[in-house]
Amino acid sequence: MLPLYVVNNYGQFNHLILRALRDLDIDAKLIPNTTPVSEVREGCQGIILGGGPDISRAGLSHEYVRLGKPVLGICLGLHVIAQEFGGTVQSGQKGGYGAVEVTITDHDGILQGYPQTMQVWASHADEVVTLPGDFDRLATSSICGNEAIAHKHLPIFGIQWHPEVSHTFEGHRVFENFFSICTGQNKG
């Protein structure tokens, strides 16, 4: 079985994504965001776009989104997905660093098994302000209107918070759910 690829977008927590996956016995590899598209297309069963400081440094991440693989975007990865499908990303009015309470509005896919509200760890200044037309909102908070999104027809998901950080309630579940989607056990 092919591994999941974790795309390093220079975020401070990207190595923790890899660690969280390995702790769940999920085969994964951290790759630079300059890895050739052909290598990503052939080498993995799913893609996790990690966070980072600036979307201009996201390398080939925008191209990875269009490979037909399941994709989970975390923080900056969410922004890449939103932009690629026509959404708008800009500086949030409140931003977020620290504990945030999110309200889940749709428990399918990557948020399956979570309670209605939960504490997560945020570390961002930008946010998705206009949701792309082919996406549904899965979660919201008082500081960010689009905390989690999912494509209506493709296995493409984005979350604003950091499930890889220990301060996020049961963050491992996002990775378990995404892996189940990648392996066909959960249709998302």
Curated annotation (Swiss-Prot):
CDD domains: GATase1_GMP_Synthase (cd01742). Residues 3-188 form the Glutamine amidotransferase type-1 domain. It comes from the Archaea. GO terms for cellular component: cytosol. Pathway: Purine metabolism; GMP biosynthesis; GMP from XMP (L-Gln route): step 1/1. Keywords: ATP-binding, Glutamine amidotransferase, GMP biosynthesis, Ligase, Nucleotide-binding, Purine biosynthesis. Its EC number is 6.3.5.2. The keyword ATP-binding applies. It catalyses: XMP + L-glutamine + ATP + H2O = GMP + L-glutamate + AMP + diphosphate + 2 H(+). Disulfide bonds: none annotated. GO terms for molecular function: ATP binding; GMP synthase activity. The active site is at residues 75, 162, 164. The keyword ATP-binding applies. Heterodimer composed of a glutamine amidotransferase subunit (A) and a GMP-binding subunit (B). Catalyzes the synthesis of GMP from XMP. This is GMP synthase [glutamine-hydrolyzing] subunit A. The lineage of its organism: Archaea, Methanobacteriati, Methanobacteriota, Stenosarchaea group, Methanomicrobia.
